[in-house]
Amino acid sequence: MASTAVMMDVDSSGVNDLHHSEKKYAEEDQVQELLKVLNEISKTTLTLDPRYIWRSLKDLSSLRNQELLNAETLCFTVNVLYPDSSSFKKNLLKFITSNHKSSVPGSAELRNSYPASFYSVNTEKKTIEVTAEINCFMHLLVQLFLWDSKELEQLVEFNRKVVIPNLLCYYNLRSLNLINAKLWFYIYLSHETLARSSEEINSDNQNIILRSTMMKFLKIASLKHDNETKAMLINLILRDFLNNGEVDSASDFISKLEYPHTDVSSSLEARYFFYLSKINAIQLDYSTANEYIIAAIRKAPHNSKSLGFLQQSNKLHCCIQLLMGDIPELSFFHQSNMQKSLLPYYHLTKAVKLGDLKKFTSTITKYKQLLLKDDTYQLCVRLRSNVIKTGIRIISLTYKKISLRDICLKLNLDSEQTVEYMVSRAIRDGVIEAKINHEDGFIETTELLNIYDSEDPQQVFDERIKFANQLHDEYLVSMRYPEDKKTQQNEKSENGENDDDTLDGDLMDDMSDISDLDDLGFL
């Protein structure tokens, strides 16, 4: 590439093009940056070490931030990288630019200067093709280009006609595990976004077809032990179930599979725990949902890219805590970059804490649209009974004996029968210690027993011990045990490698694609 000009030209070969003499230029620096990433991927082809693909996928965010994924750069790279005999070249150019007959002068000479590790020999057709790893990565770059360009219809068509049949159904290599996971992410993301933005008649049929296709490839990924692809497909299928309100189907789906917790990026695990928490919260299992949402917040990368996910997770965590009868601490609502997003939930918490049913109703009405957008409205509506129970508890602590009618007036309830029912539930749930006199229509609180004579302290300490043991076990599993330094130095000297190794865990954290979901809202 040293012989190329600073601005490399891409000529149009259209016959009827009135402006065929015009040229679009691709900057050499941008092309060189792409070639560096491709060169890193080619090392995986030679060594079968997936760390190089991890590093390349980590560089995707910087490529997008620097706007290197533009039509001119991609068009030039595809024209030079792919031989004219390649069956993938035409399809890529077709979706990058409207005129897929564009060409690069001297592309053959430039191609000859590329490393031989970029190419492989197709024994069946007896032609030279780009290696599977680089080919799939180039298709991923085109996906990102169409996504960033808001070309959703073209992206869906590209996925349906090119990516799924020509890549995912064609290649059968374990080295493609990481790239395939990314490809599936943007396949489903583009489908979901287009379905939300446009009301198509056949959207339900297309959704069923896509879900069945993901189920099919989930079986293949499980058999091949492609953990990253398997985890990605499980998350996407769960997201699809929840998008369509099929909570029971999602629960059955989870019960019939085993999620891979090894060799999986932390962002995928965080998303999986979030979905599990959502499902359990809808099914009234709040204690299990609370455990999963705490795990999701801990697993998620704590950086600017995952801010939207962390905000949504904390909103769900607040709702679950309130439904469990717990009140979040004030510091919970003052976390950095979350004060504004958690403001509606702060007012809800305040209403629940005071047992003020009137304030609770006005807060729900005021922030209804925000709660619907967060998909927590139904959970927040369930808090009405908690508000009433809290109000009854405050009243029982204040009065030794009080009539049901007075409670009805204080809590603004409909009738005395409603009050009697709610007080009965509060007594059953252990919220208050009281007796109801049905004949005279009043309740009488009893003396509170010494709490240390009950089993409550034992249960609290048991929960704390279990949490500490679970945290200890998870840290042991996630620890990296480095090899002997002498062995590493000997291997590096033999292979001639002097570059610093990066921990796989760091690469997994930085490879998060959570930020692309922020605009959609996180279930």
Curated annotation (Swiss-Prot):
Record carries keyword Phosphoprotein: yes
Molecular-function GO terms, alphabetical: enzyme regulator activity
Gene name of the record: RPN3
Name used for this protein in its record: 26S proteasome regulatory subunit RPN3
Basic and acidic residues bias spans: 480-495
Region (Disordered): 480-523
Family label: Belongs to the proteasome subunit S3 family.
Assembly and interaction partners: The 26S proteasome is composed of a core protease, known as the 20S proteasome, capped at one or both ends by the 19S regulatory complex (RC). The RC is composed of at least 18 different subunits in two subcomplexes, the base and the lid, which form the portions proximal and distal to the 20S proteolytic core, respectively.
